[in-house]
Amino acid sequence: MSTAQSQRFAYLGPVGTFTEAALKKITCDSDIKTPYANVTAALDAVRDGEADFALVPIENSVEGVVARTLDELAIGDPLTISGEVTLPVTFAFMVKRGTQNVQRIGTHPHAESQCRDYIAQKYPHAEIVPYPSTAAAAEALSKGDLDAAIASSAAAEHYDLEIREADIGDNSGAVTRFICAQKPGWIPEPTGHDRTSMAVFIDIDHAGALLEILQVFAKYDVNLTFIQSRPTGRELGHYHFIIDVEGHIKDTPVEKSVAELREICDDIRFLGSYPREVRA
């Protein structure tokens, strides 16, 4: 993704998000990194030419998918995925220095869900205030809008907050996967360890339509790694599927399976072929 020439990256901000931490794994010091308030704004920065790439979260090992990211890729103005990065996520409980009474705690809904046990044990009567990101909650805390926040230790450091307790998540080993999106056109060359993503639209009145899709992948021995249904937003009961498979669109099995799917599906939106991040 990054080259010797400086690239412009949009990401889910503000400063101190897990997305920013993930971005640091794939960028150079010379790259321009601009935070945006939400996933849509970050992706729109690429669509509008304000950025070359956008890094946004797509799924978490505990809470599952980030619906907004899936919907933007499937039914928003076209973008393709050129890479992915994963990041272990740990949460800290933070306050402004000297705080004693905690009644309002800010965080992202996914973070709240991953810290339910801690909140129930330590602050069962506190109001949980949702924010677009954990770092946005930390920023609000620094401005006096909250009594506490659940965010990353990096956010606490950036906003000069006191970490009351670290590593408060209910599940150790939680990981978030992020995707790097760009305008359609360029596709990374095959590496032998690739992932291909697509949005598949089917005729809901056709019995066995989803089974037919799965049979096509089985026919060409293509392994599915992810499948998620999402509403199309047109009518109640109308859904499309986001599908990830192992392999590159230039690999013969993937190429043939996608070509055959185009014959039996209402529509397919190619979302990219890109290197998988292989974790030890």
Where do the language-model regions lie?
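Domain-level signature for soluble enzymes in the chorismate/prephenate branch of the shikimate pathway
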Residues: 1-280
